[in-house]
UniProtKB/Swiss-Prot annotation:
Cited Gene3D superfamilies: YVTN repeat-like/Quinoprotein amine dehydrogenase
GO cellular component, one term: metallochaperone complex
Superkingdom in the source lineage: Eukaryota
Source organism of the structure: Drosophila willistoni
Protein's recorded name: Probable cytosolic iron-sulfur protein assembly protein Ciao1
Annotated keywords: Repeat, WD repeat
Entry similarity comment: Belongs to the WD repeat CIA1 family.
Repeat region (WD), residues: 12-51, 57-96, 101-140, 146-185, 192-231, 250-289, 301-335
A biological-process GO annotation: iron-sulfur cluster assembly
UniProt cross-references to Pfam families, sorted A to Z: WD40
Length: 335
């Protein structure tokens, strides 16, 4: 069994904090929330402090922020129906582009591995894919409408230009660009959850996906490609995603976020019961029937709903969380 040790508790935002995002180098992170501001934090000695406050980009709550893979750009998704792109080209962070098109709140934003594509999703049920067309230029490459409800989260595959989205319609969708006509198509629908899918994350090589839901379960999905040795049929020679494991009974309320550590393979969850839980794949786990066990639970990690968790991409075992209680916490996972 492991233990989660609280290292730092940080305050600064007014109201609930919706999102936290580590910089690719792992030595800085950004946070966003109800106060319409983005804070960028860095470590000085042994303490974290706000280095920059960006407060002029949005008119309403900022729901999510994501750094580009190169670490030069920060994208923020807001309830004001826009996505802002920030960069430090002049030495100070400034908003260099505002992406408009969604009809309602933008819930999530994600950069592709190459940094050449950006995805956004909204309460308007659509997923948009944007091409980075040059300095501060973004062009809409696709507007995708396969979901029947609010889309909560978009996440790019860690190595390929494949996009996953999670929705209030209880499903996850996969998208890829067609080799024939360069159109973006929905290539798979992952159905097993019985309520809203709040968040998703790929494992390190992108062959598996974890999802978390309002139905209080976690699910692990595996990709089966055409010609796979497990005998899973792949109609139209498209990759099929199959639910290979369901984790239930550990969470008492909706699970709002999930993070699959690319360094350790540990899975962290953020829950509406104020808790953070850590899961590890069992040593005798089978490829097509994997088993995971809860290794630790911080039942009262925050005083209110935990909205977001993310493993540090560089420092193995370091986890960040944020909550409706207005705090950010940094944790260390010990074996």
């Amino acid at each position: 069994m492991g233990r989660l040790i609280l290292e730092h508790t940080l305050q600064g935002h007014k109201g609930r904090i919706w999102g936290v995002a580590w910089h690719p180098k792992g030595n800085t992170f950004a946070s966003c929330g109800e106060d319409k501001a983005i804070r960028i934090w860095s470590l000085s000695g042994n303490s974290w402090s706000t280095k920059t406050i960006l407060s002029d980009g949005h008119k309403r709550t900022i729901r999510e922020i994501r750094w580009s893979p190169c670490g030069q750009y920060l994208a923020s998704a807001s309830f004001d129906a826009t996505t802002a792109i920030w960069s430090k080209s002049s030495g100070e962070f400034e908003c260099n582009a505002t992406l408009e098109g969604h009809e309602n709140e933008v819930k999530s934003v994600s950069w592709s591995k190459s940094g050449g594509l950006l995805a956004t999703c909204s309460r308007d049920k659509s997923v948009w894919i944007w091409e980075v067309a040059g300095d501060d230029e973004f062009e809409c490459a696709a507007v995708l409408n396969p979901h029947t409800q609010d889309v909560k989260r978009v996440v790019w595959h860690p190595t390929k230009e494949i996009l996953a989205s999670a929705s209030y319609d209880n499903t996850i969708k996969m998208f890829a660009e067609s080799a024939l006509d360069s159109d973006w198509d929905c290539t798979a629908t992952l159905s097993s959850h019985t309520s809203t899918v709040w968040s998703i994350d790929f494992d390190a090589d992108g062959e598996r996906l974890v999802s978390c839901s309002d139905d209080t379960t976690l699910k692990i999905w595996r990709a089966y490609h055409p010609g796979n040795d497990a005998g899973v049929a792949t109609p139209d020679k498209q990759t099929v995603w199959k639910c290979v494991c369901t984790l239930s009974g550990q969470h008492s309320r909706a699970i709002y976020d999930v993070s699959w550590c690319k360094l350790t393979g540990l899975i962290a969850t953020a829950c509406g019961d104020d808790g953070i839980r850590i899961f590890k794949e069992s040593s005798d786990s089978k490829r097509d029937e994997p088993t995971f066990e809860q290794v630790t639970a911080e039942e009262s990690a925050h005083e209110q709903d935990v909205n977001s968790v993310e493993w540090n991409p560089v420092m193995a075992g370091q986890l960040i969380s944020c909550s409706d209680d207005g705090t950010i916490k940094i944790w260390k996972m010990l074996d």
